Every structure is written in structure tokens, then in C-alpha cells.
Amino acid sequence: MPRPQNGFFCAIGANSWLFCRLHDGRGAEKPFHRHRGGGGLDMGEERTDGEVARTASELRHRMANTLQLLSALSRMRSQRAAEPETRRQLTWMADAIGSLGALERHRTEQGVNFAAYLQEMTPIWRRRHSSRQAELTVTCEPILAPDTAASTLALITQELIGNALVYGCADDRPGRIDVRVGRLEDGRCELVVSDDGPGFDPSAPEARERFGLWFVRSLSAQVRGEFSLTSTQGVTCRLVFSL
């Protein structure tokens, strides 16, 4: 299919990172920018580094707002759903989209400030599960996650913490959930989520489905991570990955 002349191309990457470029019709790409006096596009003038940075920041802000809106819509639909399973699935979707929206606010040119993302999400996780008597502690070393991995890591963290809060503090028992993200001596990073709940048999088929391990293992493979789970005096999930 031939390329249109002077076409405006927008592509959203796998991690919600928005890149927009202009094609000049001769095979060369030039950074897009607006007219000084209006909102149109001008191909005759290059943008300065400061203008590019401001545009990128604006795009991140708009993407975050869009994801938060989708999260709110999913949550509203879950409240109107008649079937409990439908409500559960829509709530899960709302939580996942909301987490990605929060992640967008911490993207920089160098990567995603994952510690700042976790700091923002911690009170949200506590509030979502306020009916459970859970003590949630999150610690994270200063880590910049690349765009190619940040969204996947955010979804894994969201899933593991959600599971720990639901199952580790089941039957209205008080519980403790510890989350830790840091670097290992070999240069790799690890994410550890542990609870002091009743535990379970990870080899049991019903347990794999119940805890959504299929989802976490699938995402772990996307970041070439090594995921492991132990159940002794609670459950400890560990993901070792490279950045």
C-alpha cells in the first residue's frame, strides 16, 4: 500500500507511549510541531528540545487522563452488572487500567520512575481493600524502568498485591503484606510480594486458576523474568528480571 504524501502518522506503543511524526513524502521523517500562532502543523520549522519535552509531557498527561476515564467507566459498569462474576471481571479491568493511568504520570525521557509509581499506588491499594484488616508495606529502591517493561511490571505488581490482599487476608482475618522492589548483586532486579496468610498448594490446578498465576507467568515471560512462588507460613511471590 503506497504511503500518502505528507501523511500524519501516530502510533501507540505496547506500553502506551505515544509517538507522533510527520512524513515529508520523500521517505524522511521529521518531528512534528505546531505553528507559533496557532494549533496547526508546520513542516518548515524544527522544534527545539524544550518544545519537544513539553509536547511529550502534554501527551503523557492526556494519555493518563484517558486511561483514568476508561477505568472510571469500567468501574461504573461493574456497579450495574447483575452477575457477581461480571462485576468481578469489570472491577479487575478498572483496577488494571487505573494502574496504567497512574504509571503514565511517572514516565520521563529516561524511563519510568517505578518507585514514585508505587508510592502513588500504595494508598490506592489500601483504600480499595479498606474492608480487610491488612497492613500493606511497600519499599522500592530508586529504579528507572524502560518503557518496554514498565507497563508489564505494573500489571504484575497490581495482580500480586491484589491476590495477597484478597486471599492472604481472607475470612476477615488481620494480615500483613510486604512488597519490595530492589536490585540484586548481579545487577538484576527483583519484585517480592509476600503475605502471612493461610497459604495454598501451588501445584493444585484450582489454586493456579484461583490466584491467576497463568496471567502473572505470562507477563513475566514478556519481560524475560523468572517467576517463583513459595507457600510456607503465607505466600511469597518473587520475580527476578533485568532492566
Predicted features and spans:
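Short beta-strand/loop element within the Bergerat-fold HATPase_c
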Residues: 174-187
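Glycine-rich nucleotide-binding loop
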Residues: 199, 232-238
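Short acidic helix/loop segment immediately C-terminal to the autophosphorylated histidine
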Residues: 74-86
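Conserved short strand/loop->alpha-helix "switch" segment adjacent to the catalytic nucleotide/phosphoryl-transfer site
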Residues: 44-56, 60, 88, 127-176
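Short beta-to-alpha transition helix within the HATPase_c
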Residues: 91-102, 111-128
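Conserved phosphoacceptor histidine of two-component systems
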Residues: 53-68, 72, 76
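Acidic ATP/Mg2+-coordinating residue in the GHKL
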Residues: 195
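ATP phosphate-binding glycine-rich loop and adjacent ATP-lid/helix-beta elements
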Residues: 202-230
